[in-house]
């Protein structure tokens, strides 16, 4: 089975002396694993960084055994934010979530598109809000919809929180998540409540 596709690097681990086993999220094939021979060489190591966009050519002689990748850099997302701890943390969080939650070899084109849009939007000032929306959308697309619409009412302001109970657990849900709209006034406290909600 041979194919070529664009993808984002989700994880990598050393394999033998000069190779890596990597997990990638591809546009057409979903999450895939493969060996990159020479992955620890200076040339390949420099761009084989988590969240970087690459093109992979997958070659497998036997469907029952892991194949190997030939790789080529497309967009160096990781080094772009080396000096920005928060955006770097966001990139690592995105890739870690996808690596943990996505099943192997099942295409999720909508999730792939949403990831590409989010990474492109990390340059915006409201990127943290967009990240939270992305997390909720990811959960929904994987079949775990929180159905926040049940807490919506016309008097709900963009700022502040709603105290609610979901699955017998009490939460403080930021109103901007319920309305699915970036608030005009950015609030660190609301963002904190949002991250607490999506991680519990």
Mark where each language-model region is.
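Non-catalytic alpha-helical scaffolds and adjoining flexible linkers that form interface surfaces
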Residues: 1-20, 25-200
